[in-house]
């Protein structure tokens, strides 16, 4: 049994294109407890799974996701695959794994769109929203009540108390923060999730033996990894 839950960061993104149905299915097959997908709105108000605000990194096209129609986004191809809409990812994971939705936008529109989407799916168990401010957490808690869980993707450790007071169920820290006294103290306040990588020249979600040792010593509730097979069951 693993010492913590594995969250497949952007799906099984170490081996498959990020934020795709292919990557989500592969993550579940590899034993991930949750699949993470990013959430942005198209010009038509549909929730699509893109990490970046533009298509530039994936396709070379500088167009903003928010300016692209559903038709345009569904026609996008990269690394031999295509981006998923969030309802596609949810249909893949529901009943098989949990889902962490990394909400990339502030404001009420994205939360309202997510509420409609998750309600249409029947409010499946195991859905988490990743939110970055106490204000957005409070808004989401009012809108969703307890029908979803919330992890605070807080930019700084000193925002923990505000995020918990607003209704967060868990706190996310970075691998490089895990050994800090402030991060150690947070374990007494809430379940802590750790995003691997973004240190020692590693990409977000990537790690190595030293990183896994640091993370393991922290004893988190969950870890976000690009490769869900790095930690044996």
Where are these regions (language model features)?
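Phosphate-group recognition and catalysis centered on beta-loop-alpha active-site segments
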Residues: 1-233
């Amino acid at each position: 049994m693993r010492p913590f839950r594995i969250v497949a960061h952007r799906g099984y993104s170490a081996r498959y294109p990020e934020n795709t149905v292919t990557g989500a299915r592969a993550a579940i097959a590899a034993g991930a407890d949750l699949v993470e997908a990013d959430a942005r709105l198209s010009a038509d108000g549909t929730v699509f799974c893109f990490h970046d605000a533009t298509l530039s990194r994936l396709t070379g096209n500088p167009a903003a996701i928010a300016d692209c129609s559903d038709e345009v986004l569904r026609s996008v191809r990269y690394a031999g695959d295509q981006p998923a809409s969030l309802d596609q990812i949810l249909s893949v994971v529901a009943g098989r794994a949990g889902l962490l939705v990394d909400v990339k936008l502030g404001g009420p529109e994205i939360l309202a769109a997510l509420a409609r989407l998750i309600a249409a799916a029947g409010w499946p168990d195991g859905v988490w929203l990743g939110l970055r401010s106490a204000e957005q957490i409070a808004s989401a808690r009012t809108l969703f009540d307890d029908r979803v869980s919330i992890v605070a993707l807080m930019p700084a450790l000193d925002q923990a108390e505000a995020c918990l007071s607003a209704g967060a169920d868990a706190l996310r820290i970075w691998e490089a923060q895990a050994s800090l006294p402030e991060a150690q103290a947070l374990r007494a306040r809430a379940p802590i999730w750790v995003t691997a990588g973004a240190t020692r020249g590693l990409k977000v979600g990537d790690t190595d033996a030293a990183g896994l040792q640091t993370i393991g010593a922290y004893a988190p509730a969950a870890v976000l990894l690009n490769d869900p097979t790095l930690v044996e069951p």
